[in-house]
């Protein structure tokens, strides 16, 4: 099959499977020969996690960021990964154990990505977000997600990114301890004005994540949640 990806807007289109004459058969491809988006774990430790603010906000880190300590990925290793991806993938989701925007060579990682025609994206707690970092995001990134930590630095990070013109999403971890708030915020459209989308992520019972905080498929609150999801909002929902 063939596809096209717009590095400015993120628009993606592709054909179905092609026959020997190059004609679209209308059959969806099972998979590509190479991922169109790749997660790259550039962070080995989490400055935000070690403050205990994740746990204070009710987020049980699946990366065990409060306790784990490792070195961040070197620029050389990152460059090698990017070279192997060039011409075969479209986007890099920078991640790992910590906020990618706090990597000591963050600007260089973004520059390398774009130099090889790859669009970098990442999720951050917003704990160390600055106006300069937000400007870098505007210059190089497709979108940035801010994890919902219910804190002043969360709102400040969102504001800085929006002011810089960055397509900004919110990542909201959904567990037993957060579903009531999610329902109420959706009911009232109570998320910062100007965001692109709220992406709901299920709580993971690994790392610092507990099994007791997992939502059950039979939980009646899920019906209330999806009732709100299906309504029209000022932002997209994923």
Regions flagged by a language model, labelled:
Residues 51-56, 106, 134, 182-184, ...:
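Short aromatic-enriched loop/helix-cap "lid" or pocket-rim segments at secondary-structure transitions
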Residues 48-50, 68, 101-103, 178-180, ...:
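Short catalytic/ligand-binding loop motif for oxyanion handling, primarily in non-cytosolic enzymes
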Residues 1-3, 194-238:
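A C-terminal junction/extension of Radical SAM enzymes
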Residues 35, 39, 106, 154, ...:
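A structural signal for well-ordered alpha-helical scaffolds and beta->alpha junctions
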Residues 1-39, 56:
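Flexible, acidic/Gly-rich N-terminal and inter-domain linker regions that tether
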Residues 28-76:
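Canonical Radical SAM [4Fe-4S] cluster-binding loop centered on the CxxxCxxC motif
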Residues 75-203:
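Radical SAM/AdoMet-radical enzyme domain recognition
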Residues 70, 74, 102, 178, ...:
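Residue-level preference for long, well-ordered alpha-helices that form the structural scaffold
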